[in-house]
Amino acid sequence: MNSKFTAGAVAGIIGGIVFGMMMQMMNAPTPDGGSMPMMGMVAKVVGSSSLAVGWAYHLLNSVVIGVLFALILGGRVGGKGSGAAWGAAWGIVWWIVGGLLIMPLMLGMPAFAPLTMPGMQSVAMGSFMGHLIFGAIMGLSFALLRHAGQEGMQRSRA
C-alpha cells in the first residue's frame, strides 16, 4: 500500500478482527455475579448492550490505533520481525492506556480495576494477551502491506 496511514488502518482492522474474536470468547464478571462476553463490555463503554455496536466501536478503535502506529512507529518497521515486535510493544501500550485506564474509567470503575478487583485478574491477563496478539498481528500486517506497496511502486516505475 502506498500510504502508510492506509496500511496502518488496514493492519489495525486485521489485528482488531483477531482480537475481537478472542474478546467474543472471553467472559468478564458482571456486578450482579454473572458474566458477559468482553465484547459486551466494550459495547457498554458507549452505552449500548448490542454486540454489533461493541464490534463497531472496537474496530473503529483498531483503525485509530493502527493509524497511530503507522504515524509514530511505522518508520521503525523494517521487515516482518520488526513489525511484529514493534506492534507487540504498541499492543502493550494500548493494554495499559485502553484496558487499564480508559475502559475501566468509562465503565465507572477506578483506573487499573482489572488488576485490583477480585475476580478480574484473569480478565486483565486475557486482555493483556489479546492486546499483545493484536499488536503483533497489526505490526506484521503493517510490514507486509507496506512491503507489498513499495514493491508495487517499484514495478510501476520500471
Can you annotate each of these PLM segments?
Residues M1-A158:
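Juxtamembrane/disordered regions of integral membrane proteins
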